[in-house]
C-alpha cells in the first residue's frame, strides 16, 4: 500500500461539498485499520434542514461549529454510530458524513452504511471531538487514489432530500486492482 500522508487542517476548512468529493479515495486510518472512503454526504449550515445544526448551536452540535478537522460522532436509532468530519470555517456549522468505505487493512471488506463502518472500525461516542490532525491513531490520509463517483440526493433523511449532496463511487475497478479489495 502507498504511504499514508495525513491531510492538513486546511483540507477540511473548505466548502463542505468540495471536501466531501475530495474525501472519495482518501484513506481513513483508525487504530491500525485502514479503509478507502467510497461514499460521503454533506450537511451544511443552519439553512440545511437535514443538518443537525439547523436549529442552532446545542451541546450536541457544538463541535460542528469548528474548527475544521475534528470528528463528529453521534448515535442514531439508539444503536448505530455515525462518523462525520467537521468542515468549513470556524463558526459555520458543517460536516461530511462518511457513509461507506472499503477496508484494505487488516482485511478486504466493503462496508456500506455509516453504522456498519463505525461498528467494524470500533468508532463510538468516545471518538466524538477527536482532532484528526497530528493524530497517529485516527486520521485521513492521501494516497493519491482518484475514483470516479456520482452525485445523488442524500438518503436516510426526511428533510433536505432535494440536495444532491451524496457522493458515491461508481467504479471500484481501480481500487480492486490496486488493493485487491472485493466488492
Swiss-Prot record:
It comes from Rickettsia conorii (strain ATCC VR-613 / Malish 7). InterPro entries: Formyl_transferase-like_C_sf (IPR011034), MPG (IPR003180), MPG_sf (IPR036995). This is Putative 3-methyladenine DNA glycosylase. It holds the Pfam family Pur_DNA_glyco. It comes from the Bacteria. GO terms for molecular function: alkylbase DNA N-glycosylase activity; DNA binding. It is an enzyme of class 3 (hydrolase). Its EC number is 3.2.2.-. Keywords: DNA damage, DNA repair, Hydrolase. PANTHER family: DNA-3-METHYLADENINE GLYCOSYLASE. NCBIfam families: 3mg, PRK00802.1-4. Belongs to the DNA glycosylase MPG family. GO terms for biological process: base-excision repair. CDD domains: AAG (cd00540).
